[in-house]
Amino acid sequence: MADVLADQLRSATLSDATNNEDWRRNLNIPARDNRQQTEDVTNTKGLEFENFGLKRDLLMGIFEAGFEKPSPIQEESIPVALTGRDILARAKNGTGKTAAFVVPALETINPKVSKIQCLILVPTRELAMQTSQVCKTLGKHLGINVMVTTGGTTLRDDILRLQDPVHIVVGTPGRILDLAGKNVADLSECPMFIMDEADKLLSIEFTPVIEQLLQFHPKDRQVMLFSATFPISVKEFSDKNMTNPYEINLMDELTLRGITQYYAFVEEKQKVHCLNTLFSKLQINQSIIFCNSTNRVELLAKKITELGYSCFYSHAKMQQQARNRVFHDFRNGVCRNLVCSDLLTRGIDIQAVNVVINFDFPKNAETYLHRIGRSGRYGHLGLAINLISWEDRFNLYNIERDLGTEIQPIPSTIDKSLYVYDNPETIPRPINIPAQPSSAGNAQSAAPNQGPPPQQQRPHQGQENWQNQNGRHNGSSQQQQPRGPHQNRGRGGGRGRGGFQGQGQGQRNYNNNYRGGRGGHNQGQHQQQMPNQQS
């Protein structure tokens, strides 16, 4: 079906937008992103956004947001979605799934009708903020009102906002069910029901809420599901609640082609030292570092700050205001490193991130796939480094098997062409998300287009002030000066194939014949052992 539509769209003159190019001359189009892209986003049928017959005002928003040509998932889904058919779409992380459903939603909505006409469900608050901003940016010339609502905010504010016309509601399932159940959000005439990260939304914790939400929609609704992975729960939901869905599967392989994956076998007590070595060796634009528990997130962020690197942290137990601020500031380059739990594995698009580090190795392939997908966004290059302990060796094998990929042992030197661009300052900053009001202090002074500070710059003191509201510092109260190169060097190996050579302070030399599960002794004052991962 999509191939037939593509041929028809390519040959047809669909709107006055294709006949008159004068309107494009006055657009405020951002500088072109000339970074190398992989076939994940370049393997298209040659369609243009103009071929979809979209409103000129929508095309203006698309081009002013920096979009040039549709990606494969956008080519497949947009024309089908515009026909009103249900869709099951599976595509890799970071290949343009959000625009694949936002564009047809914006095209379909009638701004003159003061009713909720599209509901977009996402699993996390950060993804809700990001998706709502994409809707606002692409539809800024359409006069469409977008509302984002999530848990962790007062219900009263949402009730007041719904007194005004709202056309698109983006949010997490629990909060939207509260609003619909109180007859505050009227979904009776909402024809579009969209789920992003559908595999997560159809997990045990969310499925009952999703089923209840569907009852508030009309029977002839259009249901669209988008995700990178489709477990059996998605098929069960589709069979029960979707009508002859059009299935799109662009997952010829599971991992992004632009991401290079490495592992290093490291004893638990040596992980911080290994991370310090990575910071000194890698050319990081921005990095996301994952831990398996909220307690370890805060402790590791504090340790990184003590080592002299700028670092934020984020996890689900933080206050919503602080989470919003972290998300906003990190996206806008205020800080170079972010330590987080799996809270930010879903859909978060920060194109400046070129390195992902699994400080704690994940337990399953699904989590691993979503974590490493935070780098290498939209066909660009990225690096994923996994710190593996002896207990993780079976998870490593299982994930390699399940994903059909091989995670290589980390070499002594990583080729910068695998993840570094010639002019990193030209990397486009993400679509700006307004900051939530807070007493952020000095952190507010960072300009939205400012790149991240040098990797060894001292952290922003203002960050600590506002993140203190979570009960703990995001770093030490007495910042240390950035460390220069040291003479002590270390090596760590992996599965008997190669090793990793690095630098660190207060560490004795590793055994040069180190292989696998043994490592050097911990002599540095900053190499305290992290707590157990189950904490």
UniProtKB/Swiss-Prot annotation:
Biased amino acid composition, Low complexity: 506-515, 523-535
What positions does the domain Helicase C-terminal occupy? 258-418
Q: Which Gene3D superfamilies match?
A: P-loop containing nucleotide triphosphate hydrolases (3.40.50.300)
In terms of Pfam families, this protein maps to:
DEAD, Helicase_C
Q: Does the keyword Hydrolase apply?
A: yes
A GO cellular-component term linked to this record: P-body
Q: Where is this motif: Q motif?
A: 47-75
Where is the protein situated, by its record's location annotation?
Cytoplasm, P-body
Source superkingdom: Eukaryota
Matching CDD domains, A to Z? Answer: DEADc_DDX6, SF2_C_DEAD
Q: What does this protein do?
A: ATP-dependent RNA helicase involved in mRNA turnover, and more specifically in mRNA decapping by activating the decapping enzyme DCP1. Is involved in G1/S DNA-damage checkpoint recovery, probably through the regulation of the translational status of a subset of mRNAs. May also have a role in translation and mRNA nuclear export.
Q: What is this protein called?
A: ATP-dependent RNA helicase DHH1
